[in-house]
Amino acid sequence: MKNMPENHNPQANAWTAEFPPEMSYVVFAQIGIQSKSLDHAAEHLGMMKKSFDLRTGPKHVDRALHQGADGYQDSIFLAYWDEPETFKSWVADPEVQKWWSGKKIDENSPIGYWSEVTTIPIDHFETLHSGENYDNGVSHFVPIKHTEVHEYWGAMRDRMPVSASSDLESPLGLQLPEPIVRESFGKRLKVTAPDNICLIRTAQNWSKCGSGERETYIGLVEPTLIKANTFLRENASETGCISSKLVYEQTHDGEIVDKSCVIGYYLSMGHLERWTHDHPTHKAIYGTFYEMLKRHDFKTELALWHEVSVLQSKDIELIYVNCHPSTGFLPFFEVTEIQEPLLKSPSVRIQ
């Protein structure tokens, strides 16, 4: 471990994914329906939910709600497969093809569709869990093991095997391009990302907290998380943060539960590290969490976990159909209009 201090002895327990030798990839697909009123999205969401039950469907799927820009909401499914071929078979199924890539959305539809599909080599992936819980992301179908590779700067990088042989820097260097407001409504767009994009899903689960701890988390810790996410979203060029969504998780029927996660993309792992190491907004999260621990005698039922991956351009497929201009990767990088026109319709888009 390149960054681990000598004689390192963590003060708290932590766990990390232990991928079986026969497993080479994780497919993580975020699939979103965007609208100012999700009542318009009911048909699409119903088709999506039904398709997840197919034999080739995901090993696990979460649902979440994101309050986005200009009053838009995103209803998002976060789906995991343990091999790319099964995912490809699922996409090819007629039940999925009914809605995949926004095929049923017309040029004036009140809804947009987007998908961000990542095919992640196992050596480009790492996880960390505060408890021995098998209900977080890939841990639904991958064992987790106790680890001492945490509680020091650089531990995230050390847990990712490929970091032993690569610095994982962006070919674009330190500076994220300035965002561009593109004409995106009524269009089917594909974004080409550069190599070594860093993806993080970092999550909080307060469902098992008692009333006092829950009140402390919501009143003290969560506001700093919201502030940090807002800063990242509004300062992309400074931080290298391409996209950061704070989402609240739901049941598959759409009921909000006591879980949230931030899903962020950075120009490189180094950009994520610099924000976590140095920026006041991240230090504030640590500070309020430590204050919560002190208030509750350093005993907590709050469950924390994250998944981090570094992605090559060929392993990211980014599609946006009839979405607002600040959705996902749209403000950055190379954008191509897919030459499969949207349906024609006399309906009027709700803006």
From Swiss-Prot:
Superkingdom of the organism of origin: Bacteria
InterPro entries: OXD
Cofactor requirements of the protein: heme b
Reported pH dependence: Optimum pH is 7.0.
Keyword Heme: yes
Temperature-related behavior of activity: Optimum temperature is 30 degrees Celsius.
Pfam families given in the database record: Dehydratase_hem
GO MF annotation terms: metal ion binding; phenylacetaldoxime dehydratase activity
Keyword Signal: no
Record field: catalytic activity: (Z)-phenylacetaldehyde oxime = phenylacetonitrile + H2O
Broadest EC class assigned to this enzyme: lyase
Sorted UniProt keywords: Heme, Iron, Lyase, Metal-binding
EC number: 4.8.1.4
Family to which this protein belongs: Belongs to the heme-containing dehydratase family.
Subunit structure: Monomer.
Function recorded in the entry: Catalyzes the stoichiometric dehydration of Z-phenylacetaldoxime to phenylacetonitrile. Prefers the Z-form of phenylacetaldoxime over its E-isomer.
The name this protein goes by in its record: Phenylacetaldoxime dehydratase
